[in-house]
């Protein structure tokens, strides 16, 4: 792939092509407890970076609400009154418009520390996801994933915070570009496939597994004992290979 920057420079990027005797086809399921579960049984733990700093973030937000700044309701009400008063003074040349209130130094200091902590959390997550996705791509010659829409999943208020902390879309996007760079097919199966409920051995569907609290189950037809997430990853791989 050739890129040009004006008429001065030219960059050539060559896609990396790997030949690995030990590489395998893997299915990948994403989750909250483990961010990635592979069909070969490998699990990548979700580090919950934001959850670990939750109390610090809450404390800072509380401090911001008590300081003179945009997070304070009295500050917002005061500026609202000033705006309305200035608006009514537009046609009066003899009246001078009042300046809006500015945040206090204490507010700005806490706001800066809050932003630093948020950036640190984002950087920790990004670094970890780069390492995880690089390891997955290194051992695979085919990757199957499941189609999902985080926006719809976030409507579940019980899981919204955990889903936001997991940043599943960010993980998948990193996996996609690394797979493309290494010429590894990455195929997504359908969104509404019952991957968790279907036995990866005989294809029997167990509706009881719809309950998210069921982490392990035994197939009523063939008697195979399943880990919920690993079984889903195996089904994702099978469906993705059929979709390819």
Predicted segments with their positions:
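Positively charged, helix-rich recognition surfaces that bind polyanionic ligands
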Residues: 1-244
